[in-house]
Amino acid sequence: MPPFVAEGVVIVDNASEFDIAQMKTRLAEAGDKFRAAAGASYQTEWRSALEIPTDTLIGEARCADLIVIEKSSRSIDFYRVADIGAAILGAGRPFLVVPGSVKSLTADHVVVGWKDTREARRAIQDALPFLHKAKRVTVIDICENDRKEAARHGVDDVVLYLARHRIKAEGRVETQLLGSGADQIIGFAEEEGADLLVTGAYGHSRLNEWIFGGMTRDLLTSSPICCLMSH
């Protein structure tokens, strides 16, 4: 049984009526802050629930085109904060993961981290609204040296696909270096002045836990720029 936490949004069997009332008050206060921040310029709706955050987020995703969520840099207590990775893999919607240090997103230059996978194909499709508005789009495949010819063919096809959507993109194929692939693509994006990275999110469920691919895990924990990820 999960412990009761004063700031959490989960009801436990031993929570008193007073505890539950406190949580409802905190949720109401959070709703007030949300509405104040949104202002009257946008049509918004506040929804809340006294449930496990990840489960609630996955459920509410049914009526969303895109989920925007802040990347947490602290140790995660999933009774307080949504498990971003599990939500991405379970919601069936694209996620825009925003580092806490990012205050705005122009998406003038978007880097697409390409692999010829279902997840990457879906990510490109989900990112089309951003790609249409971008001033520059780069599709990059970082691969082993003996895969560069096949990678170039795949990247060229993606560039052609985007051109059919009236999106001008440039293709790049880079040799994978020693170390983290996530660090390499982040470094490329930063050097090129990109502020949005589009990638597939890779993982699978085992024994009721989500097991992530190394690239996905590293991007979720260390990327200093916004990531649009789809599973």
Where are these regions (language model features)?
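A short acidic, glycine-rich active-site loop
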Residues: 13-28
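Structural beta-alpha unit
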Residues: 1, 35-67, 164-197, 203-207, ...
